[in-house]
Amino acid sequence: MNKETGLTNLYILAFTHRNLPVSEIGDLHIEHDLQEDRLTKFKSTMNFGELMFLSTCNRVEFTFTTTDKVDTKFLQKFFHSLYPNLLETERHSFATNASIFSGLTAV
C-alpha cells in the first residue's frame, strides 16, 4: 500500500501570527463549553470523516479528513457554516490567508 494512500484526504487549515494578526485569529476561537455542540454539527454539515480543533493564544488549527476538493468554494462553505456571524469580508480574509496542508505535508 502506498504510504500516501491513507493520507490523501487529510487536511490542516492553520491560522497563526505568520499569516494573520493575533487579534483576527481570536475571532476563530470557540469557547470550550460550546465546542462539542458546534463542532459536532459542523463535522456533520461538512461531511468530515474526522475533525480536530486546536486553539491557543496565537494559533487556531483545524485538522480534518474529507473527500471533497478543498478550494475557494469549500473554504467559503467552511467559514459560513462554522462562523455564520462573520462578515463576508472577514470570511474571505480567513479563506485567503489560511495555511493549507494536505497529505504527507499535513503530517
What does each of the following model-derived ranges do?
Residues 1-107:
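N-terminal ligand-binding/catalytic initiation module
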